């Protein structure tokens, strides 16, 4: 585990060995990294910069951006987004990345494209609800996101009553957009998100994973990687995952420092993505997981 509690993976060490083969052979091939580029910003940026220097086609990320959405909606291209509120579950280190990537996939479509992240903050416990009362995030957007869940764990209780040890990840973007991700174990067991654009138009959706065999959502992640192998061009931008990797590292640092705000000048970079999500075909019937 890292000092911030993140699970450490030898991604830089493995990529260094891959790079040596590239340099010795004088040729490169596409590289894909599951979930974040690395568990810390220093390694993630080194991997990204090295791939750019050697012209290595690089992709990373998870299945969240490409899986089913119910209803099948997306942020309109060049929308003037004002706020995003997302619901997540499990741990910040593992599923927090998924939630950040879900949000970033939507945020990068806004007017002007991605502009960078100014600061982040992680709050826990009662501070999560107090933040909503103070207007840090819009509780109405939270309820819109909660309304999309199919596996609603709270029953007749309120979200506040049902959530166990809640946490709130706040991402303040350089152009004024704010994203808030609430991890609500006990109240939620899925990912969902709601957003509001200028003029008050809101929308929301569930990001649905097939939690049974054959776990068909991974198919569409592999489809994206396969396309890169065939074309030599990344299917979606590595910058998205670089931004998400750096944001998670900073948010876990904030948690370590008892919710202090972390300025993120290193995440103040911009990118544009021409990638578009499309609804996958209906999933096949789920089959039981052995042993469960």
Regions found by a protein language model. Give the residues of each.
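Donor/substrate-binding cores of folate-linked one-carbon enzymes
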Residues: 63-91, 95-97
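Short, well-ordered coil/turn residues at beta-beta hairpins
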Residues: 1-3, 177
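A structural signal for well-ordered alpha-helical segments within the folded catalytic domains
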Residues: 5, 9-12, 16, 42-45, ...
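C-terminal helix-rich "cap/oligomerization" subdomain common to oxidoreductases
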Residues: 7, 18-19, 28, 228-292
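Beta-strand-loop-alpha-helix segment that lines the small-molecule cofactor/substrate pocket
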Residues: 3-64
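Basic phosphate/pyrophosphate-binding loop/patch that engages nucleotide-derived ligands
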Residues: 49-57, 76-82, 105-109
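NAD(P)-dinucleotide binding in Rossmann-like oxidoreductases
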Residues: 149-239, 266, 289-291
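Rossmann-like dinucleotide-binding domain that binds NAD(P)(H)
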Residues: 84-177, 184-186, 246
